[in-house]
């Protein structure tokens, strides 16, 4: 995830945006920084239900017990939201992910109040899926 900022830099960059158009463009830019997802990872088992767009999230645990996330979407803004979620969960163990509450970060960014209801539901579906997979690993 070297191409993506850490949590604090994400928040600083987001708060520097002058308006919501700039914030949306920043979110889209973050999505463009995600590594390409392999074709074989675009499978039903990695598909996230509850998203209006197609979303795939792959979760692997490395030898140190840290979760490595990869993902993609067919919608640019959703791909950016995937990147935001991955930044928040970066370098965490399964138990860290289960215990970590992303909502305060979204509140600091005022993110969910500026998303359409379907995008907010999709974001929640992504977080639920990641937390459920992490709980199964912890």
Swiss-Prot record:
Pfam families reported in the protein's UniProt record: SufE
Keywords from the UniProt entry: Cytoplasm
Main location: cytoplasm
GO cellular component: cytoplasm
Family statement drawn from the similarity comment of this UniProt entry: Belongs to the SufE family.
Quaternary structure and interacting proteins, as annotated: Homodimer. Interacts with SufS.
Function: Participates in cysteine desulfuration mediated by SufS. Cysteine desulfuration mobilizes sulfur from L-cysteine to yield L-alanine and constitutes an essential step in sulfur metabolism for biosynthesis of a variety of sulfur-containing biomolecules. Functions as a sulfur acceptor for SufS, by mediating the direct transfer of the sulfur atom from the S-sulfanylcysteine of SufS, an intermediate product of cysteine desulfuration process.
Official protein name in the record: Cysteine desulfuration protein SufE
Organism: Escherichia coli O139:H28 (strain E24377A / ETEC)
Gene assigned in the entry: sufE
